[in-house]
Each structure stands twice: as C-alpha cells, then as structure tokens.
Amino acid sequence: MAGVQSCQMIREASCHCGKLALRCSGEPAKISLCHCFDCQRRTGSLFSVAAFYPRAAVEIIQGNAKGFRRHSASGFDVTFHFCPECGSNLWWEADRLPDLAGVAVGSFADRNFPVPEQVVWAEEKHHWLQLPAELPSHAQNPPQAIPRK
C-alpha cells in the first residue's frame, strides 16, 4: 500500500563500556532463561537470559567484537562474541540454531523487555531459586528447534 510505513521494533544492546553495540530488528523469535553450568560460568550468575533473533536481524553498529568458540553441553559448538575492551558477552551463535543469534537480554538495559517464554537446563538450576511456576521448563534443551514467530 502506498504511503503506509511498516513499524518494526528496533532495539539496541551494548556492552558495559559502550564500545560495542548491536541493533536488533523485529521481535525475538524466542526468549529463554538458561541454567546450564556453562551459562552460569560465562555470566557469573545463576542463569542467563537470551533473546533469539534471526542472525540477519542483528547488526553491529559500533565497535568490533572478539570471538571465543567452544563445545557446549548440548553437544554443539557455540561462538561467543564479546567486547575486547570490557569483556562483556553481547551475543552468541550456536551451531544447534544456525539461523539465530542469542543476544544477552541484560545488554539491552530495558526493564520493559519481554518476559522469557521458557526455562532450559532446569536440571542445573540452584535449588533455592524460585521462578514463576507458569514458565514452561525443560530439563535440558527442548527437543525441537526454536519456532519462528
């Protein structure tokens, strides 16, 4: 239709020092909270929260990232991209999900960011941590790939 503009959500994420920034277009395909020990070590926290976007929707708008590749508990390799200055891990690309990039939700610094839709690797969750009971939970990764919205 002539004269009609599409309103697509644009969100920006940045590292702790601000020298590396991303722009994410559209809504995430899925938002997951992960308790795996790898994410606990990577974040220094009890879990990580990732917004999974199509890789083509994630664009570096400032700085250059450094990468670190390793084998994950899911049996696939993952490449983590982080700021070479402050070390913040902004996003990762898992071979298990070849079309998606997981962006660290905390890097958006947006308290109105959508709520996670699922919990993964719940078998490694700290026993005293309480999460909303209505959040679907998987002992490890869900058996199917992340569905597209």
Residue ranges and their predicted role:
Residues 2-149:
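A short Gly-Trp-Pro
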